[in-house]
Structure formats: structure tokens, C-alpha cells
């Protein structure tokens, strides 16, 4: 895939539980990831437990986002993702009150604030 994500194509809208609606730009699928731009953020989603995290974490790294995004600075290991084969992997990031975990994307298992994050539903994550 390209080194640059094409986020210039309108991809619809996303509506949050709060009722707020934002435009979605782009729609790129990489493995189990869906990547898109919402507002001024690059976001993605993946359905647990269908995740091979060791591979997918690395795959997102080549995206170069030439805009300034608000970084996420709180990082800690605070959960475990269960895979279909019953193996598990530590989750880094932090939980929010809306029952999603926001993860900071980086290469490999070590995550840090690069201003790009993903939201995962918590139903398949155990602390």
C-alpha cells in the first residue's frame, strides 16, 4: 500500500452516542483495520477478537499524516485482548467512560503518543 493515506475522498458521516455527527473522509482497509479521517483525527477500528496485533500494529506505521493532531499522552498497559485462538496480548492505552479503549498507534507492542489513535469496543477486553 502507499506510504500516504488518501483522505481526500468523502466517506460519509459518523454519529456518536452523544448525537454529534462528523464527516468521514476516506475508507481504507488494511488487514482487519478500517482507517479513516474524522474531523481532524485519523481514526481506525478493528473488531475483536479477530486481531493479529503483532502484525497490524506494524502495518499502520507507514501512514504519514501531514497535519497536526492532538497527541494522546497517557499510556499504560491496562487490559488484555483475547484472540480467536485463545491467545492473548496486552493492551496499551487508556479507557474512556463511553466503554471504548483509545490506543496510541506505533510500531510493535510499545505504544506512544503520535497523535493517531484507534478506538476499540471493550466487550472483548478483560482487565
Describe these PLM feature segments.
Residues 1-28, 112, 123, 127:
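Glycine-rich, low-complexity segments
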Residues 21-24, 34, 107, 118:
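Terminal low-complexity, poorly structured segments
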Residues 29, 47-63, 72-127:
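Extracellular jelly-roll beta-sandwich "head" domains, especially the C-terminal globular C1q domain
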Residues 30-37:
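Short amphipathic beta-strand and strand-loop transition segments with alternating hydrophobic
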Residues 35, 42-44, 65:
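Extracellular/surface recognition and adhesion modules
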